[in-house]
Amino acid sequence: MSLRDDLTINERDPLLSSFDQRQEYNTSNNTYKVNNNSNEPSVLTLYNSDELGTSQRSSYQKFVRRSQEFKMQHREFLAEFIGTLILVLLTCGFCAEQTLNIEKSKSWLTSSLGSGLSVLIGICVAGHVSGGHLNPAITIAFWVFSGFPIRKVPMYITAQLLGAFSGAALLYSIVEPAISQFDHGKRQILGELGTAGIFGTYPPLYVGTGSAVASEVVGTAMLLLVVMVTGHPNNLPFRTAQGAMIALGVTTISLCIGYTSGFSLNPARDFGPRLFTAVAGWGIDVFTVHHYYALVPMFAPILGGLAGGFIYTVFID
């Protein structure tokens, strides 16, 4: 989308008006700059102001026009990317606070509240543009049960994965000194000095794979129920506050059954940060530890999302 043709240059951007506010210094379209330093000879600098101003205006207009066109062509991708980046940055930030807290006053309540608030802020950022999926499980369930265009599915999931990876990288750039202070510069996945859990989700060692899968499937199914129910056109009391209701749902699910799996419900939220840790010093073992547990948050939420969408479509809608 191009800029409106009926706007003048100064109306489009007040910054450009500065080119037109120097006329009092111009004589016959030429501008003279005089060095008034009494200790040095006067120096006259001559340049054609109209040519310079026109060139800069033209370059700036082209940049703005191309930026606007790029944004309009990819606005849903950008919204999902930025929304997921914020979600992961804040969610993992809460995990970092819990892991690196020298007081050792860890609380699952704090982690659960952090997850819910992070989802709320991510939806606030992206919801009005892309719908605020921020989760491949939601995107796939919407495609299967709600008529979401299949051509957009790969684009949404790609944006979510890239946003999650970027959010983890941004957080690492902030908390890296604290991590190095905590683990003495030796990156560990699990154990007392393990820090990979800041980014990826890891269940307690005593939890079996079956229990973790059940937690992710049931939790994501309930999340999809909340998303679809609060988004129904006839559910006005909750539709107007859908973002807050989804955030409350995430917090509640986390408090009730999230601890057994490390709580993901979102393949992008786990895979993006896990991939980052693999290249940032923790090594490829982040994908193989705990009997290849990385496969659970990668695929179980998708199954849960489909189950939740099926239950809503068949029994509720």
Curated annotation (Swiss-Prot):
Intervals of motif NPA 1: 135-137
Purpose: Water channel required to facilitate the transport of water across membranes. Contributes to water uptake of spores during the early stages of spore germination. Aquaporins AQP1 and AQP2 act as extracellular pH sensors and enable the spores to hydrate under favorable conditions and to commence germination. Wounded vegetables and fruit present acidic pH, so the optimal pH range for germination is adapted to the relevant host pH.
Protein name, entry field: Aquaporin-2
Domain notes: Aquaporins contain two tandem repeats each containing three membrane-spanning domains and a pore-forming loop with the signature motif Asn-Pro-Ala (NPA).
Motif (NPA 2): 266-268
PANTHER family on file: AQUAPORIN OR AQUAGLYCEROPORIN RELATED, AQUAPORIN-9
Family: Belongs to the MIP/aquaporin (TC 1.A.8) family.
Domain of life (superkingdom): Eukaryota
Record InterPro entries: Aquaporin-like (IPR023271), MIP (IPR000425), MIP/Aquaporin (IPR050363), MIP_CS (IPR022357)
Cytoplasmic side: 1-75, 130-154, 230-242, 317
Localization, UniProt: Cell membrane
Catalyzed reactions: H2O(in) = H2O(out); glycerol(in) = glycerol(out)
Chain's gene name: AQP2
